[in-house]
Regions:
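Active-site SXXK
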Residues: 1-10, 88-93, 256
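Short, surface-exposed loop or secondary-structure junction motifs
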Residues: 22-236, 241
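Surface-exposed, charged secondary-structure patches
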Residues: 215, 335-381, 386-388
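Short, glycine/proline-biased beta-turn/loop segments that scaffold the active-site neighborhood
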Residues: 5-23, 112
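Short, small/polar residue-rich loop motifs at catalytic or cofactor-binding pockets
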Residues: 243-246, 370-372
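Short, well-ordered beta-strand elements
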Residues: 237, 248-251, 255-265, 373-375, ...
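Short, gly/Ser/Thr-rich active-site loops of penicillin-recognizing serine hydrolases
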Residues: 199, 206-208, 233, 261-332
Length: 393
């Protein structure tokens, strides 16, 4: 850990990369982040890359040494590249002094308790090994297994749903940001960085699971796809496939859940996951998990409610930011509050605060004649004060 920077040129670790001829004369040098985000300019290579899984490091470095073809200039746009991730695996091996497979096993898989996860199918207990198939000539045909090699860094793990759920759970544990002990094996802030899209793209004509128009913003982080649909629901996912197999997983940080599906047919699609999503979000109407309420937000909630009822000058001096009465006069706010609380009638219950973040939230005041919705947000000062306050009956 800490032995490289994402902005280091790849040639610092793989000298053969210094000789590559870029597509354009103004191309920037490929760095490690380019490989992670699929923006190195390499062409999409899924069909070809799958068949390179077993090849040794010498083949990978020979490919670079002989010269590679580019489809784009680096840092210009996203294009999926298995070769880029094979190079990342090679860098991990060189920097760590051990095969990337061993480094990942020791530093990621074992700490997560993923003891039933393998790189090489020969090491999987025979009774547990899933056999791959393809559909050909109207019948199922066995697909020969591929051995592990240099290209395994693109996604050559063999695992179970139970084991892989530990990995997905680890990603979900990064949310929300908090001050709890950070036990690793990767820092929560680093996981959230992995889940942040680069080069986001708008799919304006996208449709939802029912075929209705629903635009999607989509991008790629560090080995993860991130998409947010027209309903504001963000999913972080990746699919993968090799001859004989297919997999798909997605997790929703704001909901605290993950969905995964594995299949032993060549390029199995994500349909099972999509059906589960429909059940959760449309049928069950799953709600987002609530953010914890900060101490200052909880304190200001009680004070805001008291101010709206009493307009105590001393209290206002304590909690009102300098802009609040400049944006709308104290007199206007007082008159509006009196009208709202008179219409609502006697207060019966104040509901729990729902926080948008550590300095902004909403709550409902239940009264005899209905409810009052209250929204407020606090300043960035050391002692945060109320800079915006809205309420309606």
């Amino acid at each position: 850990a800490g032995k490289l920077s994402l902005h280091d040129p790849v040639s610092k670790y793989i000298p053969e990369m210094a000789k590559v001829e870029y597509l354009t004369g103004d191309s920037p040098t490929i760095n490690i982040e380019n490989l992670l985000t699929m923006t190195a300019g390499f062409p999409e290579d899924n069909p070809w890359g799958d068949r390179q899984l077993h090849e040794p490091d010498e083949m990978l470095i020979g490919l670079i040494d002989q010269g590679v073809s580019f489809s784009n200039a680096p840092s210009y746009k996203f294009e999926y590249s298995n070769t880029g991730y094979a190079l990342l695996g090679n860098i991990v091996s060189r920097v760590s002094g051990m095969p990337y497979q061993q480094y990942i096993k020791t530093n990621i898989l074992q700490p997560l308790g993923m003891d039933n996860t393998y790189w090489e199918y020969d090491n999987v207990p025979a009774a547990e090994l899933a056999i791959g198939y393809r559909w050909e000539d109207e019948q199922w045909t066995l697909e020969p297994m591929l051995h592990d090699g240099a290209y395994g860094a693109m996604g050559g793990l063999l695992t179970s749903i139970e084991d892989f759920s530990k990995y997905v759970r680890f990603h979900l544990s990064a949310w929300p940001p908090r001050s709890d002990a950070d036990t690793g094996p990767v820092k929560r802030s680093s996981l959230r960085e992995m889940q942040t899209p680069k080069f986001p793209r708008l799919y304006a004509k996208a449709k939802d699971s029912n075929g209705d128009p629903c635009a999607v913003m989509s991008g790629y982080g560090y080995g993860l796809g991130i998409a947010e649909n027209c309903n504001g629901r963000k999913g972080i996912s990746h699919g993968g496939a090799l001859p004989g197999f297919g997999s798909n997983y997605i997790f929703y940080p704001e909901y605290g859940i993950g969905i995964m599906a594995f299949g032993n047919r060549t390029y199995t699609g994500p349909l099972p996951s999509r059906e589960i999503e429909k059940l959760l979000f449309e049928t069950a109407e799953l709600k987002t998990r609530e953010l914890p309420v900060s101490d200052i937000l909880a304190e200001r909630q009680e004070q805001v409610l008291r101010m709206l009822q009493t307009w105590d000058v001393a209290l206002e001096k304590e909690i009102v930011a300098e802009n609040l009465y400049l944006d709308e006069s104290r007199g206007q706010r007082m008159t509006h509050a009196q009208e709202v609380f008179e219409k609502a009638g006697e207060i019966q219950k104040v509901e729990a605060l729902v926080s948008e973040n550590q300095l902004r939230g909403t709550f409902k005041v239940q009264a005899v004649n209905g409810s009052i919705d209250v929204y407020f947000t606090l300043t960035p000062e050391k002692t945060p004060k109320v800079q915006d306050l809205r309420f309606r009956f």
